Amino acid sequence: MSSFKEFYTTEVVPKLQETFGYKNVMQIPKLEKIVLNMGLGEAISNIKIIDSAVEELKLISGQQPVIRRARKSIAAFKLRQGMPVGCMVTLRHERMYDFFNKLVNIALPRVRDFRGISGQAFDGQGNYTLGVREQIIFPEIEYDKIDKIKGLNITIVTSVQKDDEARELLRLMGMPFKN
């Protein structure tokens, strides 16, 4: 068991039980998955961007990403059905906890002018989405070897349906919210 999952079971779970008064251990909120998504609209004109994005996402997550393809043709964007438009990876279990630990303790503090993340980005179902403007905040990405700075979306899916319970879970796990 990773040390961060151990921290969750020993420190976070008792505090959540005390705060929300859960009677059953299955009611206690937990992380279900973390989805990393890189949308690459400029890949329409340059296919090599997809290859570099897949490699960078593989380094960040430790898992092979899936290339996402366009579902429909859109003439205004010069997009054809089946063209690659991005890549994504879904993390669960040990890799999810390791990535969350790395995100909270290493990557987010490396963001320029970082003062915390917004507490407003919950979707009403207990999931949190965070946009990262630069992939270079992750320690696995070497600044000299990237050809273009790309952003990515990080969606943290929790097992609860209420935003306040999910916010408390993430706060106790070390997510640096503003205020």
UniProtKB/Swiss-Prot annotation:
One of its GO terms (molecular function) is tRNA binding. The keyword tRNA-binding applies. It comes from the Bacteria. One of its GO terms (cellular component) is ribonucleoprotein complex. GO terms for biological process: translation. It holds the Pfam family Ribosomal_L5_C. The keyword Transmembrane helix does not apply. Transmembrane segments: none annotated. Keywords: Ribonucleoprotein, Ribosomal protein, RNA-binding, rRNA-binding, tRNA-binding. This is one of the proteins that bind and probably mediate the attachment of the 5S RNA into the large ribosomal subunit, where it forms part of the central protuberance. In the 70S ribosome it contacts protein S13 of the 30S subunit (bridge B1b), connecting the 2 subunits; this bridge is implicated in subunit movement. Contacts the P site tRNA; the 5S rRNA and some of its associated proteins might help stabilize positioning of ribosome-bound tRNAs. Belongs to the universal ribosomal protein uL5 family. Part of the 50S ribosomal subunit; part of the 5S rRNA/L5/L18/L25 subcomplex. Contacts the 5S rRNA and the P site tRNA. Forms a bridge to the 30S subunit in the 70S ribosome. NCBIfam families: PRK00010.1 (NF000585). This is Large ribosomal subunit protein uL5. It comes from Desulfosudis oleivorans (strain DSM 6200 / JCM 39069 / Hxd3). The gene is rplE.
